[in-house]
Amino acid sequence: MAAPCGSELPANSPLKIPKMEVLSPASPGGLSDGNPSLSDPSTPRGASPLGPGSAAGSGAAASGGLGLGLGGRSAASSSVSFSPGGGGGGAAAAAAAACRGMSWTPAETNALIAVWGNERLVEARYQQLEGAGTVFGSKAPGPAMYERVSRALAELGYERTPSQCRERIKTLRRCYSRVKEHGVGKRKSSYTFEQLEQVFGQGGWDAQPCQPVLINSSGLYQELESDGSTMEDYSQEDWGNHSQDLHGYPTDQELDEIPVTKRTLKIKQESSEEAQKRDIMQNIVQILESVQLKWELFQSWTDFSRLHLSNKLAIFGIGYNTRWKEDIRYHYAEISSQVPLGKRLREYFNSEKPEGRIIMTRVQKMNWKNVYYKFLEITISEARCLELHMEIDWIPIAHSKPTGGNVVQYLLPGGIPKSPGLYAIGYEECIERPLSPHMEQSSLDPGKEGRVDLETLSAQASLQVEIEPTRIIYCYLGIAEVRTLQQCLFLHFQANTKTFSKDWVGINGFLSQNCIVDPGVSPKSIYIKFVEVERDFLSAGSLVECLEKAIGYPLKFNN
């Protein structure tokens, strides 16, 4: 059981040294993965040096010339070490060792790499890419950096001082430089060359959105101790070959255990959602392009502190170009109908947000050259109008059987709000197109003359044309400002056909004419959709033009 730091052990308590990895004797010019300060072969790998200010350590050094240290870590078992030495020399050595820190377990090392990569990436973002194409600037990290790293490790369950973190980072950087320059490493490690390349090289570190994936330290220790190869040299290629075993990703065997049906269903669901998002974004891009807005170059954070962006709703787009192609392309487009434009744009240019992290990473990796934005300010009513178009589903209007000859009645659905708002009326359009080439060829093939193809005859008899998927055409946008949504729709659909006149125009005339049908012919399928809007907002904006830009064609009965 681990003892807390600073506690005293009974005099008759035997010192138990856990089975840990033993470092090789230091060799000139050779750097190992372990702490260089603990190169004494008599010192166990898991030795815990005396920490500064430790009462137990100072007492032991003064009385018996033995430096005792207790490591209180929550995620790794503590260990006790002893080393002979005089009182003064032992205290000095203990103080120096305390700065270097106790040996690091594989889990701690991987946590440190993940945390360090995130912290360095955050620091680089605030340097405004002064590295001229490099991921991290040349400025050395200061004490505040190691303080943040120490706190981050503590949140993951690893108690490490800033000094210990600094020494371990130095060791990792030396290991990386050795393999990078000479292509060899001293020994097997709990991390891969790719991990060090991300944090110390120019490849770029992808920030971890959540707690880093850590390695099973106990399992890794078993492997390292059992294969007897901790003293071998490994090339850079060997480092990369171990990456599959060291990363915490599911193996092929684990993936095969997932039922095929569930995996297929999930893929189909994700593809459907992605297709829907892509269609919405294309619609928003169409709106932005139709009003011919100019791209603005993103230069600094102060761009979005301007007052006129603070509380406005807008349609906005994020664009980019590359060093090879100056044309600006869309990365993302959105209708900011719930969140003010200024706040939403800051999220896309804030490296701490998921949206901003993607953009900054692509600029840092030189995938993009510059980032741009454009926006179109909209009113609340226009935002609700676009919501009506993109997010509200059509509701079909049923009709009764013909009564009194050739007249049908519309049957409005229940649940129409008794409140102000916007509503749209549309009708179903079936687009006919010629028979498919295969069907035409089979019907005209001279080689089949005199023979009866029952399948072809049946298909031609039941379907003379191929019908496109249902498309609903907008024909009217209504504003329920004086009356409620329920009252407005009732006036449109419950008009008395007996008072119908040929002079009627507009939406009421269209709906009334649709009620008069020839025998055996069904009327057009009519649809409605509506959204509630506060009455005070309905008078602002150009709602009809807004919807026409969104759908790409004029409303037939609003002009």
Curated annotation (Swiss-Prot):
Keyword Ligase attached: no
Annotated positions of the Phosphoserine modification: 13, 24, 27, 32, 48, 436
Pfam families reported for this sequence: Myb_DNA-bind_4
Keywords, ordered alphabetically: Isopeptide bond, Phosphoprotein, Ubl conjugation
Name of the protein: Myb/SANT-like DNA-binding domain-containing protein 2
Region entry Disordered, spans: 1-62
Organism placement in taxonomy: Eukaryota, Metazoa, Chordata, Craniata, Vertebrata
Cross-link Glycyl lysine isopeptide (Lys-Gly) (interchain with G-Cter in SUMO2), where in sequence: 268, 343
